[in-house]
C-alpha cells in the first residue's frame, strides 16, 4: 500500500502559502492534505480491485471532487472530498484524469509508484451521476483534546449524509493524527513566524491516543441498511510543521496490521465491498 507514504512525502514539502507570505506543510484552512489522502486511497484501491479497474477501463466509473451530497431524509448537505461515480448526462467540467490531479496537487511519487500509476487505466473526472463510493479525510494536528468534538462531528456527519442520499454507496473515512510533541501552528504564527515563533506543546503519546480512541468510537456498519462507515482508517504521522520531513508512525497508538482501522485493512475492505456491491454495474 502506497497511500500513507505518498501522503507524508507530499506533506514534507512546504508549499501552502498563507497571506502573510509563510509557507506551510500543513494548513487547516487548506484542503490539500485531504485531497492527497483521498488520491492515495483511490490509487491503492485501483491497484487492489480488478473489478474497479475493469469498470474504469470500460468508461463506466469516474471521479468527482468536492461533490455536494444531500441527505434526503434530513435535508442536509455536505461536500465530500472525492467520490467514485457514474457520469451524469448533464454538462460539466472538462474531464481530468487521476494523473492530472496528482500534478495539480503536487503529489510526490517515487519511481515505483509512477510506474504502477502508468499501468492503471485512466480514471477520469466527470459530472457526478450516481455515487458509488464517497471518501472523506480529516486531520487532528494540534490542540487534540479541544479538537476532538468537532473532528468526531465532521466525520460522523459524512457517513450519515452519504447513506442518507443513497444507502448503496460506500462511505469511507480517513483520519490523520499528529503525534509530534511540538508543532508550529499557522493560526498562532501569522506575522511572527520568522522572528518570534510560538510553539504548541503536546503531551505525547497521550494526545494522539485520545484522538485515535475518539475516532475508533465512530459508528461502522457491516451491511446496507445499518448506520456507520463501511470502512475507516487511522494514520498517525509526526509533523512539526516547520519544514522538517514528515514521518509516518507505525508503532502504537497507530493501528497495527490486522486492526480494522489499519490502512491496508481499509483498502482490502473497500475492494471486497466494491466487488460484491457493484458486480453487476455496467
Predicted regions and their residues:
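Conserved catalytic cores of phosphodiester-cleaving nucleases, focusing on short active-site segments
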Residues: 82, 131-139, 155
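Short, conserved beta-strand edge motifs with alternating hydrophobic and charged residues
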Residues: 136, 170-177
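Surface-exposed cleft-lining segments at the edges of enzyme active sites
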Residues: 138-150
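Active-site metal-binding core of divalent-cation-utilizing nuclease and nuclease-like domains
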Residues: 57-129
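Substrate-engagement module of ASCE P-loop NTPases
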Residues: 157-165
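C-terminal tail/extension regions appended to the core domain(s) of diverse proteins
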Residues: 1-64, 168, 179-282
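Short glycine-/polar-rich loops that comprise or flank the Walker A/P-loop
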Residues: 131, 167-171
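Eukaryotic short linear interaction motifs
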Residues: 91-92, 142-144, 180-184
